[in-house]
Design a protein with these regions (language model features):
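N-terminal metal-binding scaffold of metallo-dependent hydrolase/deaminase domains
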Residues: 1-41
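Active-site metal-binding motif and surrounding structural segment of the metallo-beta-lactamase
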Residues: 38-54
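Short catalytic-loop micro-motif centered on adjacent basic/acidic residues
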Residues: 93, 123-126, 233-238
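Conserved small/polar residues in nucleotide/adenosyl-binding loops
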Residues: 268-275
Length: 275
């Protein structure tokens, strides 16, 4: 089996940077050497990484590979190759495809496609609906990375808007629940208001006004409340307001059942309308 030595790199891993070397055997990391440590086994290829950073393959837990059904946009082959080219070696695919990944049959179809076409490691989310929570018990955590829950409308029309269904979802699985949180009632009220003023030609600049800070906060607040009641594992995707941060604990990550993330682009925007 081929052994490759990448030496003299600045290794970035788990929040630390150290000068060292890495030995790859076949497709797996065999040794991580720090400082002046040397491997004792000969290597077939030696790469001098002086002045370079060496990072482990990244995990992207929120991808839209558009396959099946939306491949006029992209597909598993093109997107997984793009991921690999960018240093992303593991992905988790979202369920708002066509058909939606909301049944066990659709899940099997998605996983079969990924197995045959993906250039990187993969898993996928199972999409929640108002009535499919009985299927959660049949999901294998080694095949499914979590339940995707749309608490606000988005691409794919997968909104879950019944309180009874939400309680069944949060109380019906030990899998991570990855939630898209925007209050649909507030969105609808704002949409109706601006459609009265502009008809069907509502300016794009009003997007952050329609999907407002209040809409984000109220939905995230509800998700956190339901997760606490059920002791569910909740992760809120792409929060977009500073106000939402008050909903989360700053306890050590390993102890948390409720977490959140922000997209980097959202750190550079404001809710003010813009051209």
């Amino acid at each position: 089996m081929k052994r490759t030595l990448i030496q003299n790199a600045v290794i970035v891993n788990e929040g630390r940077k150290v000068l060292g070397s890495v030995v790859i055997e076949g497709e797996k990391i065999a040794e991580i050497l720090t400082g002046e440590e040397k491997t004792t086994t000969p290597c077939d290829e030696i790469i001098d990484a002086t002045g370079c950073y060496l990072l482990p393959g990244a995990i992207d837990e929120h991808v839209h590979f558009r396959d099946p059904g939306l491949t006029h946009k992209a597909d598993i082959t093109t997107e997984s190759r793009a991921a690999a080219a960018g240093g992303v070696t593991s992905i988790m695919d979202m369920p708002n495809t066509n058909p939606q990944t909301t049944t066990l049959e659709a899940l099997d179809e998605k996983l079969t496609l990924l197995a045959g076409k993906s250039a990187v490691n993969y898993s996928c989310y199972f999409g929640a609906t108002n009535n499919n929570y009985p299927q959660f018990a049949q999901l294998d955590k080694h095949r499914v990375c979590g339940i995707k829950l749309f608490m606000g409308s988005s691409t794919g029309n997968m909104l879950v808007d019944r309180m009874a269904s939400l309680r069944n979802i949060f109380g019906g699985t030990d899998l991570l629940i990855a939630a898209h949180c925007e209050d649909q009632g507030i969105i609808k009220e704002n949409t109706d208001k601006y459609k009265k003023a502009y008809g069907d030609d509502v300016p794009l600049t009003l997007h952050p006004v329609i999907r407002s800070e209040e809409a984000c906060y109220r939905s995230s607040e509800l998700a956190v409340q339901l997760a606490r009641e059920a002791n569910a594992r909740l992760h809120i995707m792409h929060i977009s307001t500073a106000r939402e941060l008050d909903l989360f604990s700053d306890a050590p990550l390993i102890t948390k059942r409720i977490t959140a993330e922000a997209c980097v682009c959202l750190l550079y925007t404001s809710p003010s309308p813009r051209d």
